[in-house]
Amino acid sequence: MAASAVGIITLLAVVLAGPLAWAIATYVERRRKAADGAAEAGASEGQVDGKEPEREEMSGVAYTLSLLGYAIGLGNLWRFPYLVGKWGGGAFIIAYLVCLCFVAAPAYLIEMVMGQYTRKSTVGCFKMIHPRWDGLAYGQALILLMVMAYYNVLLAYAVIYIAGSLVDPLPWAADSKNYFNVEVLNGYDDYIGKGLGPVQWKLALGLLVVWLIVFASLSFGQKILTKVTWVTVVGPIVMLVVLLIRSVTLDGAADGIEFYIGKFDSEVLGDLDMWASACSQILFSLSPGFGAAITMSSHTRPKENVFRTCMVVVVCNSAFSLVGGFAIFSIVGNITFRLNAAGGVLDKATGAMVATTVAEQARAGTGLAFIAIADGMRAFGSGTNAMSVLFFTVLLTLGLDSTFCFAETFVCYVEDYLLVKGSKPAKWKIVGCTCAVMYLMGLLFCTRMGIELLDTIDHYCITYYLLLAVALEAFMFTFDFGWRRLVVHVKLATLGNLRTPLGQDVVPSFFWRLAIHITMPVCSLFLFFYILSTDVVEPYGGYPVWMNGIGWSCLAALLAVTPLGFARSLKSGTGSTLPPLEQDEAALAAAFGIKSTLPPLGQNEESDLAEGATA
């Protein structure tokens, strides 16, 4: 093996592209301000004249890109194909889309509206709606810590592959599955009598690189983060299209695609475990229940059309997963084709070489995306090293987008808490402490049993808590925020915009009300208790008892924090600090020239308001 000049040059180009783009953008912005005579450039930050500092605001494009980056993450290419393979193709996709429409999308919409309405991060938002819900906010802060601890280890895998792309020939050229299992993970063959094992230095070093990138990107506010997001959102979309175009032309790709969308087992649709997996996947991918959408929406402009942005993010996120599935399974089909052409795979029971199937290769586990994409790089011929650098950089940036939002949300928790206590330390200090603690926690997942621990925590934290969180958010919205307030706010916030001069209607009204008030909480709680009943009977994943014990302990911590707000609220007797709904209605009525209070907003809400506008 020798160093690949093409790979090194490509990596340098990728590394230098970001700072160069930032320098050019900064130069242009400074020249524009100088030409305009911007006097506010030297305005001081922090509190002025005893007033609370204004919240940083993002433009509409920056807001949309940030939410796209938050939603479109590594899980779209790491978790989604793995679950499709596990549950046999088309049936899982149907369940995924149903859960998207009736659980995840409604949860995402109400988080975005509540964030924009209150102009506060999750703790402040929930306290404003009613103090009894602040325990849910603290539970979401805790789950952010747990997810950040293991999620960035997946990005460390990408860092290792980027480093491997600088070698010619690629170190995984002979066997991509063996490279992932042995060279990257160095895991155990069995769990009997094993502990976590020693920390793997490659993973630890890769994890350090990831957290240094996060620290550099978050330490200096929304403006820097916005510029970074342009690269980390647009780049993966472009590279995914390139991978898709090349992968569908490979030998055996049709077999992989047929498994992906052509295979349908109606019996699987009756398996509640599959529905639980589908629901947890869309919740993990779109990520309502973490509170990040609330925090990001609190930074958007008051006149931003969050309903339209919600639709854009929901559609683009799912489209990315579905399109990515075509690319991944095309490569899996090609892997199957090549294995069979070479004589098949070894049957451990008989010791004979037997033919393999796409279904068998698709069950490669949580590393399916890394194995498939690594193997797919051989299809680019002389450009293998350059394309490998680019594609694994794409995987890295996909994960970084989500990590940025997770970390930014947690940092906002800390900033808001310290502000209440009368302290306002520099943001880089809070970010630095967060990154350091998360790196140390992440080392647990860099051990020889790290990926098994990762899978366990992912199951108990994500599957359980997100189901519970969205159900509780539905109750909070129904009893303390209200559908009418949402409709009035969206209408008032978008009134007079170029595309919505009469304001944005939340349509179809019947569907959204049905989903938020009924299907979202009922389905979430049903799946929560169903999974609980199965895990109590049989330990998850066949992992050791002590590992499942860690998972149960993490879940117990989350469940213990959540009801604290109810206890404090009952003791203190404090209530909601939301402004009266009549105040919002009066503002909307005044905007339409209606002197009296608006009639109930229902199916005829648009005609009511239009009539007032012409009065």
Each language-model region and where it sits:
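Membrane-interface "cap" regions at the ends of multi-pass membrane proteins
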Residues: 7, 13, 18-78, 107-112, ...
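Inter-helical loop and helix-membrane interface segments of multi-pass membrane transporters/permeases
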Residues: 50-54, 117-139, 154-216, 222, ...
